[in-house]
Amino acid sequence: MAANKNSTSDAAALGWAPMKLTTWNVNGIRASLNKGLREYLFDSGADVICLQETKAMQEQVDLTFFGGYQAVWNSAEKKGYSGTCILSRVPWLSHEIGMGSADHDREGRVITTEFAEFYVVTVYTPNSQAELARLPYRLQWDDVFRAFIKRLERKKPVLVCGDLNVAHQEIDLANPKSNRMNPGFSDEERDSFTRHLDAGFLDVFREFDQSPGRYTWWTQRTPDARMKNIGWRLDYWLASGALRPALKSCTIRDDVHGSDHCPVELMIG
């Protein structure tokens, strides 16, 4: 079933104003501010901006760049590693750091903000690493995360965004055959993502766009990978099924530079 693209009356019917939200793995927030993030903050017009792989503590970042936005940070215990941040021009009702799991909350990977209509959860899913060395941990982490967002959903609908570190289907990467069983395209990781969908969450981009060649990450190990669009779709918006009537668009902004990933924008309401 395609998402509802008739936006003329949905916001009024739902009783809340439209919102623009964006997610971006910035691969180091301090470096990305000088490579395109600063301009994107000013130009995007987003109400909520979710960032992953910030690689910084809050006190290491000049917060004047975020004028007009309130911010919540979740930094890894290990300096210069992982980390997430949510910026919002819309006041939130509450926020939560992590998932409440001592085994999975040391790397700064999850932030939840509660708004009147829904939760927004940003996530930086662990990479399974070379030779799938961290795959068992990754799969356990996925299960804990799925249970966490399902608990939130008991109260109100949930939007999940971020770098989920998986290309779900062959259409989601340029070279599926040569990458079979590599980190991010193992059968186990793909099946785990399918369980998110089986739990009732929508892959919002694919609700609107079923075309190939739509990627959000390009390896820096191959200098011309982005120019040739040899990429992977690793960055997602997931939505509770109850939000389907409010989903208006989901856009991969591969024209925006500043990281090895690009932003993915969501319009809702």
Enumerate the predicted regions with their spans.
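Structured beta-strand-rich core segments of catalytic domains in phosphoester-bond hydrolases
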Residues: K55, Q60-S128
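N-terminal, active-site-proximal structural segment of metallo-dependent hydrolase catalytic domains
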Residues: A2-F65, A76-Y81, I97
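Surface polyanion/phosphate-binding segment centered on an Asp-His-Pro turn
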Residues: T251-G269
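Surface-exposed cleft-lining segments at the edges of enzyme active sites
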Residues: G100-S101, P126-D142, K177-M181
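Metal-dependent phosphoesterases centered on the DNase I-like endonuclease/exonuclease/phosphatase
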Residues: V48, G68-Q70, W141-I230, L234
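Active-site-proximal beta-strand elements of phosphoester/diester hydrolases
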Residues: M19-N27, E117-Q129, C161
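Active-site beta-strand/loop signature of hydrolases that rely on acidic residues for catalysis
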Residues: N25, L41-E59, V120, I149-E170, ...
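Conserved beta strand-loop-helix elements of the APE1-like EEP
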Residues: K79-S94, T222-P245
